[in-house]
From Swiss-Prot:
Assembly description: Tetramer of two alpha and two beta chains.
Organism whose genome encodes this protein: Pseudomonas putida (strain ATCC 700007 / DSM 6899 / JCM 31910 / BCRC 17059 / LMG 24140 / F1)
Cofactor: pyridoxal 5'-phosphate
Family designation: Belongs to the TrpB family.
Protein name according to UniProt: Tryptophan synthase beta chain
Amino acid sequence: MTQSQYRPGPDANGLFGSFGGRYVAETLMPLVLDLAREYEAAKADPKFLEELAYFQRDYIGRPNPLYFAERLTEHCGGAKIFFKREELNHTGAHKVNNCIGQVLLAKRMGKKRLIAETGAGMHGVATATVAARFGLPCVIYMGATDIERQQANVFRMKLLGAEIVPVTAGTGTLKDAMNEALRDWVTNVEDTFYLIGTVAGPHPYPAMVRDFQSIIGKETRAQLQEKEGRLPDSLVACVGGGSNAMGLFHEFLEEPSVQIIGVEAGGHGVHTDKHAASLNGGVPGVLHGNRTYLLQDQDGQITDAHSISAGLDYPGIGPEHAYLHEVKRVEYVSITDDEALDAFHATCRLEGIIPALESSHALAEAIKRAPKLPKDHLMVVCLSGRGDKDMQTVMNHMAAQEKHA
């Protein structure tokens, strides 16, 4: 496997190795083919790229900083830790990078209505935000379980004018919301644009979302070059579907000196049935239009994912991650709920930054690794979102701990 093959594509059929593809209903096939054509044309259009750059700068607030986490670095006593500050974006996470790109594409295609799925609510908020900015009606599908634990984001979406459809099927989480959104899309193919929130779904979504997120890695390269005069030694990001990770990783896949670590949600532990670690605890299968690693039982039924973090609570992973796992370019590990919570508290106290529970999984892995590494090792952690949305979850967890103390 030569280095140049780490950033292969996907190919014309949307495949990364044996992963990805377009496993969709016949009624949707013309639509995804049309979307792929439109996206290729937009990518080659200087006017589209100019408009995208304008919104990235003046609406999202990019570039965001690459911040040296000095006190966390001292606390760990090893590698020099930098945070890529995606939580400083408008709407408080990396999700808006992708939403701005897709809404500009929807506008270009003449679509009149946006739909999306959301787990933690951050993609829902980002979609509702861009829908408001461009004057488009917007329907957000959200699992009933997630609505319960993400009340603040539900209210934000409503404030922005979105209609929220609670999904009670299955476990009432992200995978069920995605199923409902796909059903809506099949029914309303003419005027509706489905704004997928992660690097999953049928081709061209995994590549398109990655491309819109790849600004994270591009900025990181330039910013670290300016600060340290060289490439990072390691990159760490949390992986649910995996768009913040793909956004950071993609720029560095062909740099053999850069070690890349994706962090899955280990829940109560990968040895239990309460986790969301598709690569460390799943097998290949097909879900939501693409072939990837999935959590499934012996009969091939999708099993429930569990994570304290609603945004990582997905039983699959983006197909490019599955490919990078198989060719061993990226190392995928898992972090438990408790480890993520410890890292959450440490980051609050040491850096004065309240990270999302998703990002706390990456921080936990960084805190584990840093002490074993030399002081000149440069580690970049993607701080994918801020933790405001997780206050209730953390409060509940702390209250439960006090009860058991």
